Amino acid sequence: PPRTAPPCQPSADSAPLASTPLPVRPSYKPGELVDYTAQDGDTLPALAARFNTSIEEIFAANPIIPRDATTMPPGLPMKIPIYYRALWGSPYRILPDHAFVNGPTLIGFNTTAFVNAHDGWLKTYRTYAGDAWRSGPELVDYIATNFSISPRLLLAVLEYQGGALSQPKPPVDKYLLGQRRIYYESVYLQLVWAANTLNNGYYGWRSGNLLEFELTDGTLTRPDPWQNAASAALQYYFAQISSGGVFQANTGPEGLIRTYTDLFGDP
């Protein structure tokens, strides 16, 4: 059966650090040129913000880039002048971008059939959402469609935090995914909050507007400048509900991604 982690807690002491050491970056001199391969959706303003440099310096280091260019073609090898900022996170990538969005990689995936093949509480769950009664799998598809997020990712989150595919009953805590806002006790609104938070992280990182955020204990973290949008989004999501060792475990190789790969294989 899929591995289910204990529900994510804001305490920094209630979960162990991931057993696999995370990679770290070397130290860089101010303005040192580093190698970077353009990712889907990368723009020069976003890259300048992430690497703490300027668009002009990127142009100077990459004469091949036309002056009127904004969005970079994915796969373009680049040199970027980097200026160190404190608290940059690990370069470990949690999830590739193609596994985050509700896109072509999901052709042929049937959420209802997948959920019904498991013994968890989600397959018998029903709720009223979007002017209709929906089963658990239908709820996942409804939110996946509305937020353009992979239903596989939503299922992995529900399993990791709530045992939705492996446990016969939901956790006693009604705030299933950790959002303790008033009136957010339902699975529906918890999942809406999760999808919205993930999207804010994904598109905020891609645009260059989200460069840092606080964990629940007030600790500041900044995603690695090379980081992909899906991994930055998951870091942002878990920052809302955890800190310290719990945050490191949630975003490390033994965290959510372990549950994802147990369910769906290597993304």
Region roles according to the model:
Residues Q39-D42, F59-P74:
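Short acidic, glycine/serine/threonine-rich helix-capping segments at coil-helix boundaries
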Residues F59-N62, G75, E138-L165, A194-A195:
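Short, functionally critical alpha-helical segments immediately adjacent to catalytic or ligand/cofactor-binding
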Residues A60, P66-A69, P151-A156, Y202-T219:
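Surface-exposed patches in mature extracellular/periplasmic domains of secreted proteins
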Residues R67-T71, L87, R152, G163-P171:
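Secretory-pathway/luminal and periplasmic proteins that interact with or process carbohydrate-rich
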